[in-house]
Amino acid sequence: MEIAMSSQREIRLNAFDMNCVGHQSPGLWAHPRDRSWQYKDLEYWVDLARLLERGKFDGLFIADVLGIYDVLNGSGDAAIRQATQVPVNDPLALITPMALVTEHLGFGLTASLSFEHPYPFARRLSTLDHLTKGRVGWNIVTSYLESGARNIGQQTQTDHDTRYDYADEYLQVIYKLLEGSWEDGAVLRDRERKIFSDPRKIHPINHQGQFFSVPGIHLCEPSPQRTPVLYQAGASSRGKQFAAGHAECVFVAAPSKVLLKKTVADIRRRAVEAGGDPHSILIFNLQTVIVGDTDREAQAKWQEYKQYVSYEGALALLSGWTGIDFGQYQPDQVLKYLHTNAIQSAVEAFSTADPNRQWTVQALADWAGIGGFGPLVVGSAQTVADELQSWVEETDVDGFNLAYAVTHETFRDVVELLVPELQKRGVFKQEYREGTLREKLFGAGPRLAAPHPGASYRRDARTAASVEEKVT
């Protein structure tokens, strides 16, 4: 049953996690109540999925990297010591068992198109969409870690713009396989005539491009969504252009309302230029919330959590994300006096969050130590709800990807304290919509709709010969 929302804007929530220890909060795995070290146990993920569905989360957004953060001091040692997203397991295997214990929760799978050919990957997507009954999304990334490129035989990472040229063609192949290879009605399951599928309605895609040659048919029958919900997280100009053309949901990590408002407006403008509706794309900002029964209790939790942050682990993350070796600087060095383009770009972004702060290397590590680059909100459910509503109203963002400090504690506090407050205000759903993830998010049909480019690859079944003309 769907409950009517108030006239205020609905807030969307995803949980943000990764098949590793600590994810965005380096060092917090050592906290006595943290369970992230249990990432390799199915019970960890099953418990999380049940908790998130109880809290009516839209989905679980699962990050991934294929590589190690080895920029800090030119080595991966710090990342290894501090479990900074290593060890890390494959995210795909998590989805099916979590889908089995839930009915509505969506699953956003991060998978890099840099390291797997689209033909077998299309089969993985269809398989997951079948097994989840249409509750899967794909976060499209072009990998950025040099260590990942080297370990698959590339001497260096492909240059940025070429990666997006590659991505555009990769998506063409995916659309042709998932949308165009099998017509609606191709699967008959006709026991009397012993005909499972009509070959007249299944077509080779005959793709020949700059990067890929794929002549054959898709190996899977159409899944509930055909193409999973498409997420994208590119922050560059080219990445945002790619998102405007392909993504249905965009994940950003803006540390301030000023920067987020600019980013959201830019993405929506690009969506219009690509021929779409500016609000047809859902935009989620990275956010971490620490919620307590009172503001004082929440602040006490935050102070407790900060004692476990690993400075070395935070620098390993920051160095990997930015390409800057922060190990060459002292903790008290002021960033604005370090004259590199990459550092000045980082300073400019964080200065919008707190223009009066003296941004030293230590201050940047402290910021990123709980929840990564996104903003942190600490307080009672009422305080946090006020703040999240202000972000939505002032920036035009649709919702948040919530990172954790301590898991599952952070998410449990959101479910038990924050969600009821948001529901009371009429800005968060009381119940899920029925249907696939796409239907739950957008309230329309299960498949890509025009003018999305993927929809243009779908064949009109009415133009094809019927099975009666082919099979007797």
Placement of each model-derived feature along the sequence:
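N-terminal glycine-rich cofactor-binding segment that shapes the pocket for flavin-like pterin cofactors
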Residues: 1-472
